[in-house]
């Protein structure tokens, strides 16, 4: 055991050094000042001991070790202290840490701990106004307590707005919502209940959707129940449900959910047809565009693998995504549609349009290079040699990107000597992920 202990300490120190590097990179994106440098070997040893004490739930012992060390060690130990739900960190400790360490990782967890401590200490009256001035409640209890405080202090519109936001976002529980309505005698309208049901169903939280049924009028009860049943794997009369839907967005969501159900049941072609029908009915809600695209992406690739290239292209190109609804989903959709058009359908003109869309929305060197390279391939396939070379040159202007390096190999006279041109590994034709 004695022989093993130095190795264990060395491994622990190595892991902690990695943690320090991660935090330093997040906190100091540029070179830090001397006072902000990483711990020395001696300080790292103290940090290892303090972390070991925390791991053993000896929070007081860890603090005692850290108090004798420079600020960087004290801060790292305190970071773990305020992040843990079992450390006994006080609200003042958490609040002070957040104020002094704005860019540290794990901030969301620390804020959650702060709210829990605020409520546990019954500090809403004295500390709530400052705490919630710069952040929204994260818990149901926090939503309720802060709304009640605002309502009691003649901030009724602010209280109602907060309750509405928490309710639709699924932060406020049904029990706490009922507590609010009993206290304030101000129930939310049915449109907010419907919005909450929509959020619950997009998050695949069927129980949360079902508990709202009693708060809705009969026609909307039927719609929410139908969609919940579909997500539970139960067959429903889709036409009747769509007829009762209050908006085109709800119609599209019902059809989309049925497409997912059919896919899970192994009815692939029926699923493709329904997904395309959903596309024709309404665009996806911006908040759930990524989920919408994930299903389209899966189905398009499944269709492509089955040799149904035309269907695959339709699923990728007709998803009705925009750069404003979800930039990540939009970029993925445009690339996949362009790739299928070029490689599988031999329609470079269509492909060029998608790669141009990709280029127009690109926000990073990697995406710019990718868009320019594939646009160049589409132009080359169309016989537009000069324009293709211009596009390859644009991609090569991003030499750190994979497609920038590939583009060098497509240029007859690259802007650097051949021996200096960076080499790409892998094949572009395989990269459709």
What are these regions (language model features)?
Residues 1-11:
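N-terminal secretory signal peptides that target proteins for export/translocation
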Residues 9, 13-14, 30, 229, ...:
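Compositionally biased, low-complexity repeat tracts
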Residues 15-27:
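Bacterial N-terminal signal peptides
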Residues 27-36:
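Signal peptide processing junction and immediate N-terminal pro/mature segment
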Residues 35-433:
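Alpha-helical solenoid repeat scaffolds
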């Amino acid at each position: 055991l004695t022989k093993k202990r130095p190795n264990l300490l060395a491994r622990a120190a190595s892991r902690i050094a990695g943690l320090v590097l991660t935090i330093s990179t997040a906190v100091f994106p540029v070179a830090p000042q001397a006072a902000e440098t990483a711990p020395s070997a001696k300080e790292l040893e103290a940090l290892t001991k303090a972390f070991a004490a925390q791991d053993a739930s000896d929070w007081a012992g860890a603090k005692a070790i850290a108090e004798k060390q420079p600020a960087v060690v004290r801060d790292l130990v305190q970071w773990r202290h305020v992040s843990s739900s079992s450390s006994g960190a006080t609200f003042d400790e958490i609040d002070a840490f957040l104020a002094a360490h704005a860019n540290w990782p794990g901030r969301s967890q620390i804020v959650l701990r702060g709210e829990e401590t605020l409520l546990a200490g019954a500090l809403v009256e004295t500390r709530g106004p400052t705490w919630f001035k710069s952040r929204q409640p994260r818990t149901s209890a926090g939503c309720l307590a802060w709304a009640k405080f605002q309502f009691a202090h003649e901030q009724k519109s602010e209280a109602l707005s907060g309750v509405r936001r928490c309710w639709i976002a699924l932060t406020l529980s049904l029990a706490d919502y009922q507590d609010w309505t009993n206290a304030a005698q101000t129930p939310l309208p049915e449109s907010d209940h419907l919005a909450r049901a929509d959020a619950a169903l997009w998050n695949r939280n069927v129980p949360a959707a079902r508990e709202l049924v009693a708060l809705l009028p009969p026609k909307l009860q039927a719609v929410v129940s139908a969609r919940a049943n579909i997500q539970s794997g139960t067959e429903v009369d889709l036409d009747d449900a769509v007829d009762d839907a209050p908006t085109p967005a709800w119609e599209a969501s019902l059809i989309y959910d049925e497409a997912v159900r059919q896919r899970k049941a192994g009815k692939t072609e029926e699923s493709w047809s329904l997904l395309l029908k959903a596309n024709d009915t309404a665009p996806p809600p911006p908040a759930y565009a990524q989920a919408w695209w994930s299903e389209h992406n899966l189905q398009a690739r499944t269709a492509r693998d089955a040799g149904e290239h035309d269907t695959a292209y339709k699923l990728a190109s007709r998803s009705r995504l925009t750069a404003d609804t979800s930039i990540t989903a939009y970029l993925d959709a445009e690339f996949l549609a362009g790739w299928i058009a070029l490689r599988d359908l031999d329609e470079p003109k269509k492909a060029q349009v998608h790669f141009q869309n990709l280029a127009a929305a690109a926000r990073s060197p990697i995406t710019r290079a990718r868009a320019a390279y594939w646009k160049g391939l589409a132009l080359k396939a169309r016989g537009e040699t000069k324009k293709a070379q211009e596009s390859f040159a644009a991609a090569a202007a991003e030499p750190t990107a994979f497609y920038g390096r590939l583009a060098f190999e497509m240029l007859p006279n690259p802007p650097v000597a051949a021996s200096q041109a960076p080499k790409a590994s892998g094949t572009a034709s395989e990269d459709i992920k």
